[in-house]
Amino acid sequence: MEAVKEKNELFDLDVKVNAKESNDSGAEPRIASKFLCTPGCAKTGSFNSYCC
């Protein structure tokens, strides 16, 4: 039983993750002016505009 206890302790990892919820991304801030928007509207950001 001692070998089993040592094996369990070997894989007993106490991991705490402190993550903050944020909407930050490399694309922020989004363009608010329609002058700089690309033509087209879609749900994706590639070659489409989020300004629509």
UniProtKB/Swiss-Prot annotation:
Residues 1-30 form a propeptide. One of its GO terms (molecular function) is signaling receptor binding. The keyword S-adenosyl-L-methionine does not apply. It comes from the Bacteria. The modification (Z)-2,3-didehydrobutyrine is found at T44. GO terms for cellular component: extracellular region. GO terms for biological process: defense response to bacterium; killing of cells of another organism. Keywords: Antibiotic, Antimicrobial, Bacteriocin, D-amino acid, Lantibiotic, Thioether bond. The keyword Repeat does not apply. There is a cross-link at T38-C41 (Beta-methyllanthionine (Thr-Cys)). Maturation of lantibiotics involves the enzymatic conversion of Thr, and Ser into dehydrated AA and the formation of thioether bonds with cysteine. The C-terminal lanthionine undergoes decarboxylation. This is followed by membrane translocation and cleavage of the modified precursor. The structure of the 2,3-didehydrobutyrine is not discussed in PubMed:1932575. However, in Fig. 5 the NMR model appears to have the Z-isomer. There is a cross-link at S49-C52 (S-(2-aminovinyl)-D-cysteine (Ser-Cys)). There is a cross-link at S33-C37, S46-C51 (Lanthionine (Ser-Cys)). Belongs to the type A lantibiotic family. Lanthionine-containing peptide antibiotic (lantibiotic) active on Gram-positive bacteria. The bactericidal activity of lantibiotics is based on depolarization of energized bacterial cytoplasmic membranes, initiated by the formation of aqueous transmembrane pores. This is Lantibiotic gallidermin.
